[in-house]
């Protein structure tokens, strides 16, 4: 059977392999270094998603507008829309898979402010979000 070749074992590569596996499509990852050495491990800030866990009435449409504006209106509008509207589901899926994230007292995902945003929209794992993301994706893959 043919296999899809994925170049790179960072977050994008592992995510692609997981998505293909969900569709029963075999894949093969070509990597220069193991996943724990990928650049994705270096990410510290967090993952932006309009989860509205901080009581600020956040929503994907506002996230979309702020992302498009932060990109000086040069980004592909459709890509920004897809990214911002799928972000809550992606973060919730990662959390359901066991990704360690900082939590509020009520057990919801804690979010903090980050550049270019008017709402607390960044889900994070202290200063090791990238490491937690890669660990989770490696377990699922």
Language-model-detected regions and their locations in the chain:
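Conserved N-terminal/central alpha/beta ligand/cofactor-binding core
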Residues: 32-140
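N-terminal Rossmann-like FAD-binding beta1-loop-alpha1 element of flavoenzymes
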Residues: 4-28
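A short, basic/flexible loop-to-alpha-helix module at the beginning of a structural domain
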Residues: 1
